[in-house]
Amino acid sequence: MTVINSNISAIRASNASNSANKMLGLAQERLATGKRINSAKDDAAGLAIATKMTADVRAMGQGIRNSNDGISLAQTGEGALQEVTNMMQRVRELAVQSKSGTYSTDDRSSMNAEVGELQKQIDDVLTNTKFNGVTLFSKTAGTDVSVVIATGGSATDAVTLTSKGIDGTKLTSTALDVTDAAKAATTITNIDDTLKQVTATRASLGAGQNRLESVVNNLTNNATNLSDARSRIEDTDYSSETTAMAKAQILSQASTAMIAQANQSQQNVLSLLR
């Protein structure tokens, strides 16, 4: 039966054309943005998962940066204490030298002058060594300096760097004096005591640095794996989408041609009236 009020073929072809154009637009959007999920309507569940993964990856990235800052802080402190150790060793050496009875008062005075300069520098390093404004050392025995390094988004994701307190009373100009044998002996005792504290602080900072380096390695691996998983969820598969776009283009062209054919068949009805 031939009718003219409803062109079912043209309607069906038009619907097919609309579907093909939507498919084409979606494929082109995904290819242009590189994202399979560009809005919640594309994949609501996938978007939620990918968003959470993105938050985790960014937190890990900041944790890596924080950890590297912590490593730099530990290196700054350890480097300063290395110089303090060298100076303290030199003071001890001069004290041992001063204990010998072969040196005159003038000789010991010259030795003490060097000790005095070293004492000032030791005090300066322990007082003024800072990292981004954070004081790294305490000159009070038993009073430690602790710096918490956030390594992730959770409250428990943290590493504490601890700088042990160093007894500053044993590093004063009075405590380090080699003007006579008795004072030199006291100086040796004071140096030995504080060297133990300095060594303990260096060990603490070194252990913290090693832990932070492990944290960086672990976070880097986790962030890489999580980024890869997120990519599989939200990123465009170019081979698949290119195929989908080609298919949509063919369907769009074919449906447009069929619309023309369906409209032409309606025109043929006129020939029956001639």
Predicted regions and their residues:
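Primary detection of the long, small/polar-rich alpha-helical "axial" segments characteristic
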Residues: M1-R274
